[in-house]
Amino acid sequence: MNLIAAAIAIGLGALGAGIGNGLIVSRTVEGIARQPEAGKELRTLMFMGIALVEALPIIAVVIAFLAFFG
């Protein structure tokens, strides 16, 4: 049962991060296409947003380890 809980935690964390990263990058590309002169600022904000979204799978892995070994 612990193995299933760990797999679900990691899977949902990765799924959410993948969807979030896709949305962030697609909106950034749309913004750069509309205003190419704002590309540098948009790219910086994109990487900050991706870093925040990628924190969730890391937390999911920690929760999975706690569920598996705890």
UniProtKB/Swiss-Prot annotation:
F(1)F(0) ATP synthase produces ATP from ADP in the presence of a proton or sodium gradient. F-type ATPases consist of two structural domains, F(1) containing the extramembraneous catalytic core and F(0) containing the membrane proton channel, linked together by a central stalk and a peripheral stalk. During catalysis, ATP synthesis in the catalytic domain of F(1) is coupled via a rotary mechanism of the central stalk subunits to proton translocation. Key component of the F(0) channel; it plays a direct role in translocation across the membrane. A homomeric c-ring of between 10-14 subunits forms the central stalk rotor element with the F(1) delta and epsilon subunits. The record marks 54 as: Reversibly protonated during proton transport. Belongs to the ATPase C chain family. PANTHER family: ATP SYNTHASE LIPID-BINDING PROTEIN, MITOCHONDRIAL (PTHR10031), ATPASE PROTEIN 9 (PTHR10031:SF0). One of its GO terms (cellular component) is proton-transporting ATP synthase complex. F-type ATPases have 2 components, F(1) - the catalytic core - and F(0) - the membrane proton channel. F(1) has five subunits: alpha(3), beta(3), gamma(1), delta(1), epsilon(1). F(0) has three main subunits: a(1), b(2) and c(10-14). The alpha and beta chains form an alternating ring which encloses part of the gamma chain. F(1) is attached to F(0) by a central stalk formed by the gamma and epsilon chains, while a peripheral stalk is formed by the delta and b chains. The F(1)F(0) complex interacts with SpoIIIJ and YqjG; YqgA is found in the same complex. This is ATP synthase subunit c.
